[in-house]
Curated annotation (Swiss-Prot):
SMART domains given in the database record: Carb_anhydrase
Subunit note: Homodimer; disulfide-linked.
Species, as recorded: Monkeypox virus
Tree of life domain: Viruses
Native organism taxonomy: Viruses, Varidnaviria, Bamfordvirae, Nucleocytoviricota, Pokkesviricetes
Entries under PANTHER family matching the protein: CARBONIC ANHYDRASE (PTHR18952), CARBONIC ANHYDRASE 7 (PTHR18952:SF124)
Family per similarity comment: Belongs to the alpha-carbonic anhydrase family.
Name this protein carries in UniProt: Cell surface-binding protein OPG105
């Protein structure tokens, strides 16, 4: 079977809760950002120091870079989805197996060489003072292929979510250049809309007319799961707040199944028949809203 391409939509009802997946040991206290770069496609920050271990990892994986993704609007900018729920953005923390391999380039040639942590960004009413330290650096890399020293004290630990339960699966790097094991924290960190909009002011590589344009979005659409791809979860299986069908209600279960069928149709035809794909994803949005409203009503009825 071919390797599972990343990113994916994680269906929580199909994920396997595995008690053997212990809490990760995250050692970012000694990690320091060295440079920040506008690649023309994304924001990349290079790090020195810091590593992760524990969990299911055979040994220590050192932090190399972080990549930041966003969308045109605040409601969709993440690569990965949880039950078709889209987050405002996503940070990918790329690590490599330094104990076993001599370099990142060597590590990415092997299926146990790369680990990527995904942290979701969710727009809220309040600014994130820690994320702001990254935002403050963006003026120094406004044009494509610009790089600058990261000249602010920055502690990556402060960008970790409040809950560190995680999903994990075997996939690829976002650009599909290497195999990678993914660790995805479903609990997002909150940022302000103004902070995210600053990323949309960055310039990308020139288009066919030779004129630079803005990186208004850079997220990737999810890929269909291979038949043999399995997603595991380190805690009790959760459901995203906007996709919590009440299983006692058969009508809601039917709506949930219909929504998933529409999303599968969207994934299948997005590269071909875009019209039908757009219709399918519109139905996904509508059904998600209906399910959310019905689940809220059901919750109130239970409380009463």
């Amino acid at each position: 079977m071919p390797q599972q391409l990343s990113p994916i939509n994680i269906e929580t009802k199909k994920a396997i809760s595995d008690a053997r997946l212990k809490t990760l040991d995250i050692h970012y206290n000694e990690s320091k950002p060295t440079t920040i770069q506008n690649t023309g496609k994304l924001v990349r920050i290079n790090f020195k120091g810091g590593y992760i271990s524990g969990g299911f990892l055979p040994n220590e994986y050192v932090l190399s870079t972080i990549h930041i993704y966003w969308g045109k609007e605040d409601d969709y900018g993440s690569n990965h989805l949880i039950d078709v729920y889209k987050y405002s953005g996503e940070i990918n923390l790329v690590h490599w197996n330094k104990k076993k391999y001599s370099s990142y380039e060597e590590a990415k040639k092997h299926d146990d060489g790369i680990i990527i942590i995904a942290i979701f960004l969710q727009v809220s009413d309040h600014k994130n003072v820690y994320f702001q330290k990254i935002v403050n650096q963006l003026d120094s890399i406004r044009s494509a292929n610009m790089s600058a020293p990261f000249d602010s004290v920055f502690y990556l630990d402060n960008l970790l979510p409040s809950t560190l339960d995680y999903f994990t699966y075997l996939g690829t790097t976002i650009n599909h250049s290497a195999d990678a094991a993914w660790i995805i924290f479903p609990t997002p960190i909150n940022i302000h809309s103004d902070q995210l909009s600053k990323f949309r002011t960055l310039l990308s590589s020139s288009n066919h007319e030779g004129k630079p344009h803005y990186i208004t979005e850079n997220y990737r659409n999810p890929y269909k799961l291979n038949d043999d791809t399995q997603v595991y979860y380190s805690g009790e299986i959760i459901r995203a707040a906007t996709t919590s069908p009440v299983r006692e209600n058969y009508f809601m279960k039917w709506l949930s199944d219909l929504r998933e069928a529409c999303f599968s149709y969207y994934q299948k035809y997005i590269e071909g028949n875009k019209t039908f794909a757009i219709i399918a994803i519109v139905f996904v949005f509508i059904l998600t809203a209906i399910l959310f409203l019905m689940s809220q009503r059901y919750s109130r009825e239970k409380q009463n």
